[in-house]
Regions:
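Histidine-centered, transition-metal-coordinating active-site segments
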Residues: 1-24, 29-37, 66, 81-87, ...
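Short pre-active-site segment immediately N-terminal to the catalytic Zn-binding motif
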Residues: 35-47, 76
């Protein structure tokens, strides 16, 4: 199922450039960052790796533009909402029925962090019934995505690592595609200029 990441670009589509980030590279980078953090904190590295490698398995082609298009079409025809994290859970749990643990599925569902979050403290989740209710809420309430918080420290680490992984790579891709003319715009960045420095500084 990992092959579902093949040929899906991270942000920039329709560019013939081997250096542009793809989903497969992104999830590996998230996994590496999260495992490094998890190792320092004494967390479950197997759970971290499972969440990290599976978190974007339901993402659309053409990045978030593809997700936005599918969401608009899906909502217009069904009244429900499409979100890639919810679809990742659907792919693993419903379509392929892979018997994945509650903690792994929850980490995948709750990995989105594209909004301000100064603290990531695990939420309470005891059973699949409550998890399924949380998934269903995401289908019918567009704001439910913004309230998702992982139920484990491992899930929280992956969520933070996801942001660390794409901040620098998205900058690099923007420069390689000439969307940004020069690296000088990042020269004074507090988190670092290059991806490696950004990762090291944020970890």
């Amino acid at each position: 199922y990992y092959n579902r990441y093949a040929d899906k670009t991270q942000v920039f589509s329709f560019y013939k450039n081997d250096d542009i980030s793809h989903r497969a590279l992104h999830v590996q980078l998230v996994s590496r960052i999260a495992r490094n953090i998890g190792r320092m904190l004494g967390l479950d590295l197997d759970l971290i790796e499972a969440v990290a490698l599976g978190h974007d398995i339901g993402h659309t082609p053409f990045g978030h533009a593809g997700e936005k298009f599918l969401n608009e079409s899906y909502h217009a025809n069904t009244g429900r909402y499409f979100n890639h994290n919810v679809h990742s859970v659907r792919v693993l749990d419903k379509i392929f029925n892979l018997n994945i643990s509650l903690q792994t599925l929850d980490g995948i569902l709750c990995h989105n962090g594209e909004f301000e979050c100064k603290e990531c403290r695990p939420s309470k989740l005891d059973n699949f019934k409550d998890f399924d209710a949380k998934v269903e809420e995401c289908y019918i309430d567009q704001s439910a995505i913004d309230r998702l918080v992982p139920s484990t420290l491992e899930g929280c680490v992956v969520r933070i690592s996801d942001m660390i992984a794409y901040i620098g790579k998205d900058r690099q891709d923007a420069i390689k595609t000439k969307l940004i003319d020069s690296e000088s715009v990042f020269a004074e960045s507090e988190i670092g200029k290059y991806n490696a420095a950004i990762i090291n500084n944020l970890i």
